[in-house]
């Protein structure tokens, strides 16, 4: 095996293991929101996009409707469609199963690893290695987190309410940094989303404020058109 392939695999597996550990936090958060172990596992296996999963259980845990929970998850998941368009020429998967697998594993981390690779072959290797490691780790730790949370006492279970916002922020912050390189702008956008959610909380059904805050941040981060001649 060449040094380049070894380095690509090492980086992919390392990133996959690190990100996969968030699955334990999701499993605990899903339990706190009232989902059982199997429901948490099905979400991780079929949805497989961390920020959307945390948004969904966060809305459900706050008493929001299923429609609001799905809406917030879909809003956060739309970026994967853009990633898919970018990765399609690079991966060029053949066969129904490979295309379905590639589409399912199009997330932030696999996209970043694939497009950062120096050539197409290493890009494909980085995508599949990162996707496989994160997928296996995420689902395994989801089960462990849900099982561990279900065995906690009442006081400890109440403390799980802090998991959703903390893990949600940890997953979203790198995206916010990419959209807004300046630290001061990052803080203003994050604070603006929080203000939107707080102002709407007494006025709208539970969960709707989360969707509105996500929309506000997404609109703030949309690409700006440059003026002609600039």
Which sequence ranges carry the predicted segments?
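Membrane-embedded alpha-helical modules
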Residues: 122-212, 219
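C-terminal ends of transmembrane helices
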Residues: 82-91, 112-119, 170-180, 219-230
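Helix-loop-helix hairpins and the membrane-proximal interhelical loops
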Residues: 1-47, 58-73, 150, 226-230
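Helix-loop-helix junctions within the multi-pass membrane cores of secondary transporters/permeases
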Residues: 70-161
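Alpha-helical transmembrane segments and their membrane-interface exit regions
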Residues: 48-52, 75-82, 166-172, 214-226
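Hydrophobic alpha-helical transmembrane segments
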Residues: 13, 41-42, 69-71, 98-102, ...
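Transmembrane helix boundary and interhelical junction motifs in multipass membrane proteins
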Residues: 21-25, 38, 49-56, 79, ...
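Juxtamembrane helix-boundary/capping and inter-helix hinge elements in multi-pass membrane proteins
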Residues: 3, 32-37, 61-66, 89-98, ...
């Amino acid at each position: 095996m060449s040094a380049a392939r070894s380095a690509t695999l090492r980086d992919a597996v390392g990133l996959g293991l690190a990100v996969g550990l968030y699955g334990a936090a999701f499993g605990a958060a899903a339990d706190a929101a009232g989902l059982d172990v199997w429901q948490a596992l099905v979400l991780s296996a079929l949805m497989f996009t961390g920020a959307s999963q945390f948004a969904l259980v966060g809305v459900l845990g706050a008493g929001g409707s299923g429609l609001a929970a799905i809406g917030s998850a879909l809003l956060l998941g739309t970026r994967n469609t853009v990633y898919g368009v970018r990765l399609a020429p690079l991966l060029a998967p053949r066969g129904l199963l490979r295309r379905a697998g590639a589409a399912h594993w199009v997330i932030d981390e696999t996209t970043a690893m694939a497009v950062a690779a120096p050539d197409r072959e290493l890009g494909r290797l980085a995508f599949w290695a990162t996707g496989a490691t994160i997928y296996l780790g995420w689902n395994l730790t989801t089960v462990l987190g849900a099982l561990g949370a279900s065995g906690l006492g009442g006081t400890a279970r109440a403390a799980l309410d802090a998991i959703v916002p903390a893990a949600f922020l940890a997953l979203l912050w790198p995206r916010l940094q990419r959209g807004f390189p300046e630290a001061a702008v990052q803080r203003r956008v994050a604070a603006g989303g929080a203000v939107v959610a707080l102002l709407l909380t007494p006025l709208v059904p539970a969960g709707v404020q989360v969707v509105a805050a996500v929309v506000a941040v997404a609109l703030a981060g949309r690409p700006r058109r440059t003026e002609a001649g600039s």
